[in-house]
């Protein structure tokens, strides 16, 4: 783009047209792995008659998508990722909405195992969003990290 002349120039393609994508495409073999524990995804929706509120829970046990706890056999690394999503809200008050994610991530192999626990909650009022939570991390069962989160973000018309 040349603003002094208001000309917009694009390069011209000078190669040969392709037949299309290679329908015999090859890829590397899958990494050998073993499922150590089968996973599942539980889903529930509950309605509370007394508070006129709903709770929706999606709970990935042994994997975010239910893939289970698995080990990459060549290197011995084990992966476990559990993720629970919980949303609650009253029919009478949209500002009562509360969304919490509880996450556990374990990775490692013999002599080196990380374990992280993360909980984050989002709520709101008419002016702000609030994000609170914490993270704890351990290596080989020794606690090595903690952080608390507490943020307020203006809604700016949202």
Give a label for each model feature:
Residues 1-158:
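Glycine/threonine-rich phosphate-binding loop and adjacent beta-strand/alpha-helix elements that clamp
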